[in-house]
Curated annotation (Swiss-Prot):
Protein name as annotated: Coenzyme PQQ synthesis protein A
Transmembrane annotation, as ranges: none
Keywords in alphabetical order: PQQ biosynthesis
UniProt effect for mutating residue 16 to D: Abolishes PQQ biosynthesis
Organism: Acinetobacter calcoaceticus
Gene: pqqA
Length: 24
């Protein structure tokens, strides 16, 4: 997966942040 779409990147970052807070 080498997508360079801003939307996809923003979604991935948002998902990682959500998982980070959920892990806490």
């Amino acid at each position: 997966m080498q997508w360079t779409k801003p939307a996809f990147t923003d979604l991935r970052i948002g998902f990682e942040v959500t998982m980070y807070f959920e892990a806490r």
